[in-house]
Design a protein with these regions (language model features):
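Claisen-condensing/thiolase-fold acyl-transfer catalytic domains that form or cleave C-C bonds
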Residues: 65, 69, 94-96, 108, ...
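Short beta-strand segments
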Residues: 7, 91, 122, 147-153, ...
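Acyl-CoA/ACP chain-elongation machinery
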Residues: 143-165, 221-229, 303
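Short, flexible helix-coil linker/hinge segments at the edges of structured domains or between repeats
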Residues: 156-182
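Condensing-enzyme catalytic core mediating Claisen C-C bond formation in acyl metabolism
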Residues: 1-61, 177-269, 364, 374-379
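Short glycine-rich phosphate-binding loop at a beta-alpha junction
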Residues: 83-91, 290-299
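Short acidic, glycine/serine/threonine-rich loops at helix termini
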Residues: 18, 99-101, 132-133, 158-163, ...
Length: 379
């Protein structure tokens, strides 16, 4: 089998960054009143700015599809034209239609003269990793001479005030128990829009940094866990999920069915422990230790989890010190499926990488507890 390399990365982040005090100018106010919980949640998640495909009037400036296409076009140059691309793999947690798939909509937006293989991955944060794995396997097996993996989100569409019913904000409980903030309010002040694209080829780029993909492993713990994060559905007292089509149309808004929701009890109970369980399994499978990792790229939904990961990984015997971490969440926000690509893109062009260094990327997905790990070598 061939080696496969990430030879180029590109991004599209819409409009100007939005600071913490500007958010409700874009998203609107629930019940016409400023959120009293916003500052508490932001203090916990550590995000200082994010990007929205919205203007201050709440009007959409870019679609998910348009942003993905713009990021992909950022890969093109004199060495790669649109019609040179063999395969397109797209991941998103926020598709804008049920049918056609997000991927073929991106292909249609790109245009060009040549047909190509296109695949889409639906779900949540791991869909970017899914797209990267599918693209890398096709290049590695010789089915494609190159491939593009994209990950993009327009989650601001789900964060607007019109998607939320009036709900009380239990400020005292939020202060005393930060985990309670990981509900609708937390997610509303965390998520960000944007798109990233990676070019994969069978040999390193002629100049600059390339990253050889050593392996990508993905797993799901849905067989033993309940749904934790969901949208377009409601969860009953027995832990069963009921999709939007099970409800009368008049309840879609009154029950905030299309707001992104999180079961904070399950998140606290499982998200870190299961991720480390899987990491230890992979360290045995691929024969590596924490000492072999020069750069650790963890997709964090919130900086709230940083110290908890450090503490638990030390206790479990796979400790990567913070000075070897690379995280850009505070400046780009949580872009869900694109967050892993965002770290790769920024680190790739940072001037900080040295040949031979090992990069371990971790993407946890709380929806029903899936995890993606990817090991890369700097070339």
């Amino acid at each position: 089998m061939m080696n496969v390399y990430i030879t180029k990365a590109a991004k599209f982040l819409p409009n100007d960054p939005v600071g913490n005090d500007e958010m409700e100018q874009y998203l609107g106010m629930i019940d016409g009143r400023p959120s009293k919980a916003r500052r508490i949640v932001l203090r916990s998640n550590g995000i200082r700015q994010r990007y929205y495909a919205l203007n201050r009037q709440g009007e959409v400036t870019h679609t998910n599809v348009q942003m993905a296409a713009l990021a992909i076009r950022g890969l093109l140059d004199e060495h790669l034209q649109l019609d040179d691309i063999d395969l397109l793999a797209c991941g998103t947690a926020s598709p804008e239609q049920l049918v056609p798939s997000h991927g073929v909509m991106v292909h249609g937006e790109l245009g060009g003269q040549r047909n190509m293989e296109v695949v889409s991955f639906a779900g949540s944060c791991c869909t970017g990793g899914d797209a990267l794995k599918y693209a890398s396997m096709n290049v590695r097996l010789g089915y494609a001479k190159n491939a593009v993996a994209s990950a993009s989100e327009r989650i601001s569409a789900w964060m607007r005030a019109s998607y939320f019913q009036q709900e009380s904000e239990q400020l005292a409980q939020l202060e005393q128990h930060p985990m309670l903030a990981f509900q609708k309010e937390f997610l509303r002040w965390m998520l960000s829009d944007g798109a990233y694209a990676l070019l994969l080829q069978g040999s390193p780029g002629e100049s600059g940094v390339s990253l050889r993909i050593e392996w990508i492993d993905i797993t799901s713990f849905a067989n033993t866990t309940e749904t934790c994060m969901y949208a377009g559905a409601e969860k009953d007292s027995q832990g069963h999920l009921h999709g939007w089509a099970s409800f009368p149309e008049q309840e879609w808004l009154t029950q905030s069915l299309f707001a992104v929701k999180q079961d904070t009890r399950l998140l606290s109970e499982h998200i870190i422990g299961l991720g480390i369980d899987y990491l230890l399994e992979l360290s045995a499978k691929y024969h590596f230790s924490s000492d072999d990792v020069d750069w650790f790229l963890p997709h964090l939904s919130s900086m709230f989890f940083k110290d908890k990961i450090l503490e638990e990984s030390r206790r479990r015997g796979f400790f990567i010190p913070e000075e070897r971490w690379f995280v850009n969440l505070p400046l780009v926000g949580n872009i869900a499926s694109a967050s892993g690509f965002a770290m790769i893109e920024e680190l790739m062009y940072s001037g900080r990488l040295e040949k031979g260094q090992k990069i371990l990327m971790m993407i946890p997905e709380s929806a029903r507890f899936s995890y993606c790990y990817c090991m890369m070598t700097v070339c």
